[in-house]
Amino acid sequence: MRGMKSLVLTLVAALVLPLAWAQSGDWAEETGALTHKDGFVDLYLDAEGGRILVALPAPDEEGVALRAIQATGLTAGLGSNPIGLDRGLANGGEIVAFRKVGDKMVAEIENWTYRASADNPLERKAVRDSFARSFIWSGEILGTGPDGELLVDMSSYLTRDALGVRAALKEHPKGGVYQLSDDLSMPDVAAALAFPDNVEFDAFLTLTSDEPKSEVSATAADARSVTLAQHISLVRLPDEGYTPRLFDPRSGAIDVGFYDFSAPLSGQVGQAFARRFRLEKQDPSVASSPAKEPIVFYVDSGAPAEIRDALIEGASWWAEAFAAAGFPDSYRVEVLPDGAHPLDVRYNVIQWVHRQTRGWSYGGGLTDPRTGEMLKANVILGSQRVRQDRMIFEGLAGASKTGTGAADDPVQIALSRIRQLAAHEVGHTLGFAHNFAASSNDRASVMDYPAPLVWVGQDGNLDFSTAYDTGIGEWDKVSAMWLYRQYPNGTDEDAAGDELLESAWASGLRFVDDPQGRGVGTAHPYSSVWDNGADPVAALLDVMRVRKVALDRFGLDALQTGEPTSRLRAVIVPVYLYHRYQVNAAAKMIGGYDFHYAEAGDANVGGSPVPVDQQRGALSALVATLDPAALDLPDRTLDLLTPPLVTFRGAGAGAEYFAGETGAMFDLLTAADTAASQTLAALLHPERVARLIETERRNRNALSYGDVLREVEDALFGEAETPRQAGILRREQMRYVSTLIDLAANTEATPETVTQTNAYLSALSRRIVSRSRRADPVDVAVRDELSRRITAHLDRPSPPLVPSAPDVEIPPGSPIGAGSAEACWHCDTTLLPR
């Protein structure tokens, strides 16, 4: 038996050893004629065959050959703002594990949202197995190296739709249903790069459709076959020298949330780290010391010189914040070196991106999801924004001021806005959230959305000297100190952070992030977008004065020599609606509720309604924006607003203009309806009305919903000063009733809101009919029609017939594609891949 056993072992060895040598031979055969690049993982590039082979390390006991952070983006994009597939777009990063399963290599996205911090491996495994894993790709193993390395063809991994391009096209109503064409998709072998801590890949993705839609047709050479360049980075996991900082909602930081199922019963399962770069002092024993490795940003060398200089200047403002946090000379901004790939993870890049129309700017980047450590910043700035800003200021100041270099030079004001924009978007990548209350603190943060601060001077002219601020604000320094300050050993960091934030609150600084700042119906009285001033009501009065001066002077001076006069139809929009965002800000005083983000033990816990006298002042200011005299334009202006020529791909027509039903003649009534609808929508937002009702329940002396309705009714159903203004007043009456009917039919409105609104409409119907008996015949007809609409609304069965009047299409103020933030022409945001 022993002899037979020896014979069997000999035969097995004879079979296995040649197989091992054959695998090594396969490796040599596969790679012998290919270009080898040594790096984080070795690459073998097959230029003729269009393949990229990767040598992965020998698998561990769990079969994992490589664990890395993956970032995915677009080297070349679609160019459509609404769809958002821009050059430079990138996701926030994820950890991918390449695992050997049988004879295949499988790529798995690890789920770090759910984790266990315990040392017990079985506890960690229990959490890991409780939530679905994601296998995203598998490929054949081509060969095995002498030390167990595995040779894999990664070409199909690189050409899969890793960024969700098909979904983005499908989800947009003007995108279309596309399929990924395998024949027309391939890796860009020449673009593959290998470095010690990362490898970088580009691939051409071609998506085809038999029924492309308008947004793709407007930007692609052939909308039936759209080719984008997808970029994938694989990055070495950071070492263990980074110390995460727990997120504090009071700090102005950005959170990286997760669930830790190892948390004790006395703790919270839901937790979060603050997102930030790694900074370590050269000398940690002193309060202020340069960092061992500074943070360096690089500006796209493809930006025009004056833009590039403005971007560098604005982004450089953050050096002051880092100095305040104890890191002098630890942050700088330079021009991207020639030949550097903007999506290479070694570079924090500010990209200047071109699109068909103006659009949003983004500040995001690559984050280690395990710790919140920021590894690469990625800022996208749209090139058409600055041109839109210049046009707006030419509408306010006159195009004759362009190029003068004076304080009212539209180009210089627009460049000031670009500096602010660069600082804002870089701020997001550094870990700072929006602070939409900063405008109420003397522009205390670049993380607000800044409206231009323009005044009517004593001479009656517009003063642009303070249009945009320079440098970071006081809140930015506080937030940077909380996020980046490195404390001496033995310091209670939580207590030190609390002391810093409490001192900031004591000085009057406020912080309010997106959920309570963006929406028109939100409650915080000092948190809005594109507003100005510590007193939003006083600021609205100032803005209305600026608007009046600009409209009184509006004419051909708003155009540069040689521009078509029809362009005035585009310029008039932001001037006529110049008050739109300050209206929203003032409306937040009505039914407003002041509060701070706080923790138990803080001195400033709780909230309180806005004092009733301030609410009444806001109501009066808002109702004044409905004055027909404020919404009318003189004939000399109206007759200059001739229609544009519709040219190449519809250029000259579309969303940037007021809608209208009068053909070539400018439709003033629709413009007035548009402006009035902004005010009425803000006043009668379902959330605001619900708060008014609740506040009155708690305090009978509060401003009530009925008070608001009565003041608006008195303004809209009184006598017009002139027959000319009567037409505007009638259109506003229609919009008012329509808004109330829509409010009562809104499924998100509270029962109290619906009940009180319907009761008011019933009474209003009786009042306007009784008044109309002595009125102008046109007034009689309009009021009878309004009464019929109200009766039809009250009598109709469920579901309601809405809308009760056609909606007016409001030209975009925010960059096109704004979505929830719509409601600026001076804008920016981070739609962040966060």
Task: Name every feature range the model reports, one short phrase each.
Residues 1-9:
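Bacterial N-terminal signal peptides that target proteins for export
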Residues 9-18:
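Bacterial N-terminal signal peptides
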Residues 23-303, 321, 335-388, 393-410, ...:
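Auxiliary tRNA-acceptor-end handling modules of aminoacyl-tRNA synthetases
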Residues 59-61, 304-330:
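Zn2+-dependent metallopeptidase catalytic core
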Residues 89, 268, 301, 305-313, ...:
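Soluble non-cytosolic domains of exported or imported proteins
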Residues 316-327, 355, 427-428, 432, ...:
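Sec-exported extracytoplasmic/periplasmic mature domains
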Residues 335-353, 416-472:
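The catalytic-center signature of Zn2+-dependent metalloproteases
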Residues 441-834:
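Conserved catalytic/binding loops enriched for acidic/polar residues
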